[in-house]
């Protein structure tokens, strides 16, 4: 059996068999529903920890967000127009500069531009995406604290 035969052309027969066995012979429909309820509760708790950390650590004068209603991602909008260099740099250049400062502070978020449907189009907003899917509560809190420190440094805001 060639790797290409079970990887890129169609869903893997092996993974389909494993999933079938799990759902049909072990969990059943009720077990799958129980798992979905469990993961929903887990994500809700993690989301709430992240939202609490955002309220505590992020500078609202240059950042905004809406609580996620589902899923595992949290989008953070940056008011790049308030950045000291906004008249001299493009949105993409500022996004990269801010992103690098965030990484230098030991936090990791995804640049919003990575998710544009048309990367060549002109964009006049700046977002970063964070996730709360797998990190322990204390790591979420620490990451958002570091994110806030990085944003304050970039925007020359007073420390909290």
Where are the language model's segments positioned?
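PLP-dependent class I/II
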Residues: 1-160
